[in-house]
Amino acid sequence: MGLQGQLSDVSSDSIPLMLLALLATFFRHVRSLLLFPSSAPVVVVTSNLSVLADQLNLNRLFSYRYSDNAASDCIVCLSKLKTGEEVRKLDCRHVFHKQCLEGWLQHLNFNCPLCRSPLLPHHHQGHGSDASISAFPLRSTSTASSH
């Protein structure tokens, strides 16, 4: 089945974004290993990419043309939402430009830009994080030396 089977419902526009997020996470991890080798954090890349893929897919599926006459602002770009623009309303009822929310997600922010409520329910956020394989080996933070 592999990666292709898992990403079959993700738009082709989302794949470069996921690869970019993976590369950014990899370089951030390598940098942390070089700068702070004894306290390097455990990075679970597959979990973050899974959440990113889910969010990009939801953003694509649940975006719509804005038609409200009320003067609302997109808190990400600080512009007024105009009739006919592609927007996405989150579960917390906040509305953003579709492209602005995608940019927010590219930075691995999985919460509302305004109220910080999680974009995915807690039971879904934890899904896969225990079962996923870390892309980097676990580092012991204990003071005992094995040399």
From Swiss-Prot:
Disruption phenotype: No visible phenotype. A zinc finger (RING-type) spans 74-116. The keyword Cell wall biogenesis/degradation does not apply. PROSITE patterns: ZF_RING_2 (PS50089). Its EC number is 2.3.2.27. GO terms for cellular component: cytoplasm; nucleus. Induction: By the proteasome inhibitor MG132. Down-regulated during reinitiation of mitotic activity. Keywords: Abscisic acid signaling pathway, Cytoplasm, Metal-binding, Nucleus, Stress response, Transferase, Ubl conjugation pathway, Zinc, Zinc-finger. It catalyses: S-ubiquitinyl-[E2 ubiquitin-conjugating enzyme]-L-cysteine + [acceptor protein]-L-lysine = [E2 ubiquitin-conjugating enzyme]-L-cysteine + N(6)-ubiquitinyl-[acceptor protein]-L-lysine. SMART domains: RING. It is found in: Cytoplasm; Nucleus. Pathway: Protein modification; protein ubiquitination. GO terms for biological process: abscisic acid-activated signaling pathway; cellular response to hypoxia; positive regulation of abscisic acid-activated signaling pathway; protein ubiquitination; regulation of response to osmotic stress. One of its GO terms (molecular function) is transcription cis-regulatory region binding. SUPFAM superfamilies: RING/U-box. Gene3D superfamilies: Zinc/RING finger domain, C3HC4 (zinc finger) (3.30.40.10). The keyword Plastid does not apply. Expressed in vascular tissue, root tips, embryos and pistils. Pfam families: zf-RING_2 (PF13639). The ring domain is sufficient for the interaction with NAC19. E3 ubiquitin-protein ligase involved in the positive regulation of abscisic acid (ABA) signaling and responses to salt and osmotic stresses during seed germination and early seedling development. Acts additively with RHA2A in regulating ABA signaling and drought response. Possesses E3 ubiquitin ligase activity in vitro. Interacts with NAC19. This is E3 ubiquitin-protein ligase RHA2B. It comes from Arabidopsis thaliana (Mouse-ear cress). The gene is RHA2B.
